[in-house]
Amino acid sequence: MHKLTPRQVEILAFIKRCLEENGYPPTRAEIARELGFKSPNAAEEHLKAMARKGAIEMTPGASRGIRIPGSEVESEPTSLPIVGRVAAGAPILAQQHIEETCQIDPGFFHPRADYLLRVRGMSMKDVGIYDGDLLAVHTCREAHNGQIVVARLNDEVTVKRFRRDGDKVWLIAENPEFSPLEIDLTEQDLTIEGLSVGVIRR
């Protein structure tokens, strides 16, 4: 299989997650919505490129006609990528961010983990998340008040507790030495990259 672009890696991870959780692949519109494309046509172009590279197979004319070659006979994945420092503006699962893999079943976590993020700093120590820990992350774009999220703010990735009231969001540390980050969504870009679903201490 030819090497995928970082965006295509994200699409493939989303397709796999839909297959695991729902039993069927996503539509082009669902991919576009999940990845923030302006239209399903953009998703279609990525899918065609991925098919040419051998990452997926497509059934013409079928809205969910996406198949991962060999997926019916492959065993469940037993490892997760470990993501280190994330470069500004780059997708979290871009190849250059992956340090190594950890031999653990993604299904050990609920919902399933998509990757492990190496924690930097002690801003979440009061909930048992310490510098150097591996945070198991389930990729999603929505969060509810009180959840611990991986968020991207001004191209920096951070782990904090999420709270929202209208157009105001607070990213709250679990350490009294750190002040909450207050974000006005009308003025700043905030992206939820995923939810914390567990911690591995190393």
From Swiss-Prot:
Catalyzed reaction equations: Hydrolysis of Ala-|-Gly bond in repressor LexA
Swiss-Prot/TrEMBL keywords: Autocatalytic cleavage, DNA damage, DNA repair, DNA replication, DNA-binding, Hydrolase, Repressor, SOS response, Transcription, Transcription regulation
Active site, per annotation: S123 (for autocatalytic cleavage activity), K160 (for autocatalytic cleavage activity)
Alphabetized CDD domains for the sequence: S24_LexA-like
Gene3D superfamilies cross-referenced by the UniProt entry: Umud Fragment, subunit A (2.10.109.10), Winged helix-like DNA-binding domain superfamily/Winged helix DNA-binding domain (1.10.10.10)
A Pfam cross-reference name: LexA_DNA_bind
Coiled coil: none
Annotation: DNA-binding region: 28-48
InterPro entries linked: LexA, LexA-like, LexA/Signal_pep-like_sf, LexA_DNA-bd_dom, LexA_repressor, Peptidase_S24_LexA, Peptidase_S24_S26A/B/C, WH-like_DNA-bd_sf
Family: Belongs to the peptidase S24 family.
Subunit field text: Homodimer.
Protein's UniProt name: LexA repressor
Organism of derivation: Azotobacter vinelandii (strain DJ / ATCC BAA-1303)
Taxonomic lineage from the root: Bacteria, Pseudomonadati, Pseudomonadota, Gammaproteobacteria, Pseudomonadales
